[in-house]
Amino acid sequence: MKRFAAVSLAALMLLTVFASAASAADVIEIRGPVYNGSDINDIIDTYGENNALTIDATKFAAFYYDIDDNVTTETLSILAVPGTEGNVIGEGGIVYETTIQQVDYEFYRPAAGWSNYSLIGFFAEKYIPINPDKADKLAKLVLDSDDKYTIRTGEQLDLGEGYSIEAKQVDVDGEKVWLEFTKDGEFVDDEIISVVSGSDNTWEVELDDIQDEDDVVVLRVHVNQVFQGAVDSIAQIEGLWLIDYTNAMKIESDDEFGNLDNVKINGDTLTITNEDTFTLTRDDEEEIAEGLFFKTADDTRALRFYAMKQITEPGTYEIRGEVAEGDFSWDATNFAGFFYDVNDDVSTESLTVTGLNGGNVIPEGGLVYETTIQMVDYEYSKPSVGWDQFPVLGFFAEEYIPINADKADKLAKLVLDSDDKYTIRTGEQLDLGEGYAIEAKQVDVDGEKVWLEFTKDGEFVDDEIISVVSGSDNTWEVELDDIQDEDDVVVLRVHVNQVFQGAVDSIAQIEGIWLIDYANAMKIESDDEFGDLDNVKINGATLTITNEDTFTLTRDDEVEIGQGMFFKVADTAASDLRYYPFVEKTIDGEVVDDDEDDDNVTEPVDNDTEVEEPTEEPTEGPTEEPTEGPTTEEPTEEPTEADGTTPGFGVVLGLVGLLAVVYLVRRNN
């Protein structure tokens, strides 16, 4: 019996070691249109044409898109080739194609040589072809900016990916600046740039032997002004463009990209297809190539899927809807920002624009946001033990739970809905996110019960003893009163899978957690305003918000709709209109900085005024991807490690426990 206990403890310890050693990063999923049909051929017939279903950047927010120039480069197609049937795509039936296009510099000054450049999207990333008309040699675009940056002599401007420029000196007349370009602190090139009348003020760095190509422009810098002051010498830069030439790549015909392995290069066009069949496995994510996936629903009655891109790098990302040119309507199938449950095929939100009549002004009541409560399955779906469904409401692209299942007026954000397994020792806390945690206080001597405690910001909320003996449902529901004047509100559900009382440790295994942020629950009133949406109507399970005043889609601007949702409008002629809705999602964390020596690095801030003697240190510099701006608090999809504690065993403690088990076994022998 002792040997059995020791072996059982060892198994659970091993599970815990691996659970605590692996840390799940936050992930943003950018999805394409949702396709739903009886099988793949039905979907191609319904959504495609000429035996082909094609997705481009106007529909798939992950693909590169320039709204001002209306430029796309990438398409992903599914073809009705032989072998395409059921949920299987035949050989050559997946076609990824991208073609070089010309786009304007952000710093658009054609008279000064800043007009346009060649760009190609490559698996939802922006690349620059080394040869403007050949798609075989590519370097990632690091920076394309028209912001103004002011740097003192001796200071560096961090451009990202380890690249930087430094203002070495300014001449005594304040007409020239000596700039130096470095990579990972190593000298690359330098130049003296003049800003006197008649100069183009632009420095182009050309390098040789970039994938066997010479005279490759890797950096462009436009110096706006130079100032020689009594205290400081400074240069103002407006216009930066940079490629990651050190990691340039050459694409060969025998290269493979995930499940796409048949590569064809025809001048400015790159085409990659699948040589083998591709199965859309239900309830799974199948990688197409380079971080692009097909996500397929867990539904045996139909085939439902979408293409998507997974992002894990820290930063703030724009998630857009389908591009419109007039009156239009978006829901979760064509706006990736809206809540969508692919398994249950459930969406709740819609956004509609009517009454434009060829102009860019939406009349009163012409902008309508509507959302309706729907039922979805728990991630831990076990109807036999009470884990079947719960009500959900998308609210401005966030997932909320109605306090009353059939009323859309009182909402709390969903923090967690998980079917992952977590193993915690007595005395340890499991961080659930947003300041919520549960702790295993004690396990009974028979290993059949566990005492759990629920806290918020370290303060006691509730506790319970959960039994796992046969016949118990093993689920703890925390019900609280006075949540927006409602009583008996379920705020937490926890399913305890196993309890173990060992010779070394007492542990509990949890599988199934559901939590709402009840502490920040809100009530929506009819006189509330959400940005420019200020006419609120609540009709049972449906919430409708419209505009009481006219709403102008200002060209070359981002216009807030409400609650962090915007329209981005293209810089077009007055006779044209092009726009899309978007939200921003943020992955927290520090962006990796290749330059570890920060003592002499200043990241300048934008400066829209004439250069004067600076009184403060500039504080910010350009990055490839925006890291500031409106951030969206996202529900935590998985519990994370609390500060100072680890859910489950740490690796070291786990190993110590294993050694103890070995000792017990040897002693009993």
Curated annotation (Swiss-Prot):
Protein known as:
Major S-layer protein
Q: Gene3D superfamilies recorded for this chain?
A: 2.60.40.4190, 2.60.98.40
Q: Name one GO biological process term.
A: cell wall organization
* Keyword terms, alphabetized: Cell membrane, Cell wall, Cell wall biogenesis/degradation, Glycoprotein, Membrane, S-layer, Secreted, Signal, Transmembrane, Transmembrane helix
Q: Which residues are glycosylated?
A: 36, 70, 116, 600, 607
Spell out the Acidic residues composition-biased ranges. Answer: 590-627
Q: How is it modified after translation?
A: Glycosylated.
Which cellular component terms (GO) are annotated to the entry? extracellular region; plasma membrane; S-layer
Specify the species: Methanosarcina mazei (strain ATCC BAA-159 / DSM 3647 / Goe1 / Go1 / JCM 11833 / OCM 88)
Q: What InterPro entries does this protein map onto?
A: PGF_CTERM, S_layer-rel_Mac
Superkingdom as given in the UniProt entry? Archaea
Question: For this UniProt entry, what is the primary localization, expressed as one broad class?
Answer: secreted
Q: Where is the signal peptide?
A: 1-24
**Stretches the record annotates as Disordered:** 588-648
The subcellular localization recorded is: Secreted, Cell wall, S-layer; Cell membrane
Q: What does this protein do?
A: S-layer protein. The S-layer is a paracrystalline mono-layered assembly of proteins which coat the surface of the cell.
Cross-referenced Pfam families: PGF-CTERM, S-layer
* TM stretches of this protein: 645-665
Family per UniProt? Belongs to the Methanosarcinales S-layer protein family.
